[in-house]
UniProtKB/Swiss-Prot annotation:
Pfam families: Carn_acyltransf. (R)-carnitine binds at Y486, S488, T499. It comes from Rattus norvegicus. Its main location: mitochondrion. Keywords: Acetylation, Acyltransferase, Fatty acid metabolism, Lipid metabolism, Membrane, Mitochondrion, Mitochondrion inner membrane, Transferase, Transit peptide, Transport. This is Carnitine O-palmitoyltransferase 2, mitochondrial. One of its GO terms (biological process) is response to fatty acid. Its EC number is 2.3.1.21. Gene3D superfamilies: 1.20.1280.180, Chloramphenicol acetyltransferase-like domain, Choline/Carnitine o-acyltransferase, Choline/Carnitine o-acyltransferase, domain 2.
Amino acid sequence: MMPRLLFRAWPRCPSLVLGAPSRPLSAVSGPDDYLQHSIVPTMHYQDSLPRLPIPKLEDTMKRYLNAQKPLLDDSQFRRTEALCKNFETGVGKELHAHLLAQDKQNKHTSYISGPWFDMYLTARDSIVLNFNPFMAFNPDPKSEYNDQLTRATNLTVSAVRFLKTLQAGLLEPEVFHLNPSKSDTDAFKRLIRFVPPSLSWYGAYLVNAYPLDMSQYFRLFNSTRIPRPNRDELFTDTKARHLLVLRKGHFYVFDVLDQDGNIVNPLEIQAHLKYILSDSSPVPEFPVAYLTSENRDVWAELRQKLIFDGNEETLKKVDSAVFCLCLDDFPMKDLIHLSHTMLHGDGTNRWFDKSFNLIVAEDGTAAVHFEHSWGDGVAVLRFFNEVFRDSTQTPAITPQSQPAATNSSASVETLSFNLSGALKAGITAAKEKFDTTVKTLSIDSIQFQRGGKEFLKKKQLSPDAVAQLAFQMAFLRQYGQTVATYESCSTAAFKHGRTETIRPASIFTKRCSEAFVRDPSKHSVGELQHMMAECSKYHGQLTKEAAMGQGFDRHLYALRYLATARGLNLPELYLDPAYQQMNHNILSTSTLNSPAVSLGGFAPVVPDGFGIAYAVHDDWIGCNVSSYSGRNAREFLHCVQKCLEDIFDALEGKAIKT
């Protein structure tokens, strides 16, 4: 049996906040072109990864109904139950059989991979706020290294070293170790590298090590989402050697790899970035970057206008760049300012379509903002961790380093766009939409300092289950109801796995929340503790099922996708208001833990929802929440704080304060 993996990914537009490392990071090499020199090739396990299972239809129906119970009244539930029975014995049975047959014919991938790419790429909403999340780096532990030029140079060099290490197959394979004393050793690595790739996964399995899918990694670099009518496309050009830099809405490119594929001298990179930082040009009257925040069909049409007006070569340089480095010209005021800056900014200094934007503010605060269609949080977090560690432990330059004496004006190309009247009007319209939308977004955060993972584990409770219970209690306290809740879980243990949904709202969390919020005096502390234990046990079961590909959301989505692809009328199950309500995720939650991350976040996935990024640390709990004007994030966090206080009081044997 495979392990209970607790890797979280991002929801439709996922999240994160600081926590403990999910895996030991691999050994670091010296300051050369490579981060690591793994003796096991990076993709050694990829061919032998197990395939993502398709759940039994009857199991999916049971799990779906269990998730609906806390959201529906008796009459609504009976209707949904009847629709499920009809679906299971009728059209659902036929679709499931077709899905199984299709899966057998496509053993190179997973049943969800194609539909999931389509889900992202056919979405016409702006990718800003609706999809793209961010994660912010912790400051460099050595304060003098947080100078903007120093940090931008070191992060850039480390990112390119990651690229080189990945391309050379020298990056340690991503492996989840249940018994690292046996599997995460030089002796095991020397042995497993001689096992053929077609069998290597089984060799790791024998020592309780579980390699994870790494198919998304090749889209990290040189990649851009290109807007097209109806369906966007992902573009990658692995031959490109240049970096794209944005500052004050201006575009610059220069090579970070030479003609032989070696990393350009870090002092030259430092010189080029210093040259860009010294450019005193004002923000353009019509910043082209706003276009990447538009509706995708609108942007596709405007992009064609850009090409028609002679900007094709300029766009190619933008699209093929190794990545986009954004140099902001202001410091961070506080965590709220940081979240707004890294999640959306002012729209002038991000190319939202790039696989990722590496953002460095004037005070050295840095973050990764990434486009979501190409990959999930697991791949980005690995890159994030390695770059943070490399840039802080083996920095390419020091604060005392002198930039190379090179002619940056010849090496750095400033890109310019020819803009017709129609394009200028398009940029103006995009700016107005962008400004209007981001003004409606509120973000706030709390740090609950009374305890965290260590205390909860002593009480034999799942830390994640307790955090999710607090969100259920808080929403009940604020709005008096239980609503559809989404927690993302990675299925990277399988070939081309993406994510599965954990549904944290259950009959157990509803009962427990009502006891705490509505009538705590009617229950003894022992009864409250027992209810929390039930919640924890059930949440653990849901988490295990999701990580093993045994949720219900992706299966039902794939069946719906197949029905549409076959030209069938949408089965009645999908027209049920209960189904639509469940997929209107008012509470969208995600957690990714890393010692490199200071904060992360994402916007709500529905207008009346919350985007909840959180982490349970050893001795505190962090939560970063976003909302639009229809909800109140600050008030919600006050309720979360109160609910966590109540939970900890009950666990300590104290009466709940009303």
